Amino acid sequence: MKVAIVFLSLLVLAFASESIEENREEFPVEESARCADINGACKSDCDCCGDSVTCDCYWSDSCKCRESNFKIGMAIRKKFC
């Protein structure tokens, strides 16, 4: 019985690590060239890379990509870009 539990645990661990590896988000070269990193120049939220990064024009004349305080709302908004 203990052997079966250990075997099933290893099996679940193997599948979990494989699914995590498949879900890693890597930007293709073309997509990373189209979007700006943190502190990069932007005109709208869609210009910034990542689901939780927003275009911030509040503090200065030049807009820059910044980490958003509302990560869930920003992730939903980025789906429509």
Curated annotation (Swiss-Prot):
Cellular location(s): Secreted
Tissue-wise expression: Expressed by the venom gland.
Principal subcellular localisation of the protein: secreted
Disulfide bonds: C35-C49, C42-C55, C46-C81, C48-C65, C57-C63
InterPro entries tied to this protein: CNTX (IPR035285)
Coiled coil: none
Any Pfam family hit: D_CNTX
A single Gene Ontology CC term: extracellular region
Prodomain positions: 17-34
Assigned keywords, A-Z: Disulfide bond, Ion channel impairing toxin, Ionotropic glutamate receptor inhibitor, Knottin, Neurotoxin, Postsynaptic neurotoxin, Secreted, Signal, Toxin, Voltage-gated sodium channel impairing toxin
One term of GO molecular function: toxin activity
Signal sequence residues: 1-16
Function: This insecticidal neurotoxin targets two types of channels/receptors. It reversibly inhibits the N-methyl-D-aspartate (NMDA)-subtype of ionotropic glutamate receptor (GRIN). It inhibits glutamate uptake from rat brain synaptosomes, and blocks GRIN in hippocampal slices. It also acts on sodium channels of both insects and mammals.
Domain notes: The presence of a 'disulfide through disulfide knot' structurally defines this protein as a knottin.
Entry's family note: Belongs to the neurotoxin 03 (Tx2) family. 05 subfamily.
Misc note: Protects against glutamate-induced neuronal cell death in corticostriatal neurons from both wild-type mice and the Huntingtons disease mice model (BACHD). In addition, it also protects neurons from Abeta peptides, which are the main components of Alzheimer's disease amyloid plaques and are very toxic to neurons.
Protein name (database record): GAMMA-ctenitoxin-Pn1a
Species of origin: Phoneutria nigriventer (Brazilian armed spider)
Organism phylogeny: Eukaryota, Metazoa, Ecdysozoa, Arthropoda, Chelicerata
